[in-house]
Amino acid sequence: MALSFSLLMAVLVLSYKSICSLGCDLPQTHSLGNRRALILLAQMGRISPFSCLKDRHDFGFPQEEFDGNQFQKAQAISVLHEMIQQTFNLFSTKDSSATWEQSLLEKFSTELNQQLNDLEACVIQEVGVEETPLMNVDSILAVKKYFQRITLYLTEKKYSPCAWEVVRAEIMRSFSLSKIFQERLRRKE
């Protein structure tokens, strides 16, 4: 069962206060949230990854979008935001709800939602107005296509437990790679 609307609204309302007073220390706040999300993803594992080796798949993580130094901070935040938004969407489906232990899935979704709110506040602070910055459209598109490949894979595998395990491992990998990206941003500041 998907997260109830009232639970999501409660999370949004509670997050609103922190958004209004949040200073944008992207590497610090997002890195902490990223670590919590990784821990929750690790706890969500229900079957041995070794039993799913035949289902492994290369989803073509857009590494080059996270390697470049061409990003302004606001653009980098937008790419991270898109990755987390797509992850949130993926794990908010009814097929996802049927696969994972409900309380862990809710905690994971809440953590992703908080990260999205924090990143939105950072974009606003970086740009100085409540409009999204000009962003690297190609990078955002690359992230969207990456998640389309993941969704297509799940559909082709009929949302099997092994398919979800492969996807869970892939998302953990992408979060780990985004952490490296954030550390690079921190060094640039």
Swiss-Prot record:
Disulfide bonds join 24-122, 52-162. It is found in: Secreted. CDD domains: IFab (cd00095). SUPFAM superfamilies: 4-helical cytokines. Residues 1-23 form the signal peptide. One of its GO terms (biological process) is humoral immune response. Pfam families: Interferon. Keywords: Antiviral defense, Cytokine, Disulfide bond, Secreted, Signal. Belongs to the alpha/beta interferon family. This is Interferon alpha-21. It comes from Homo sapiens.
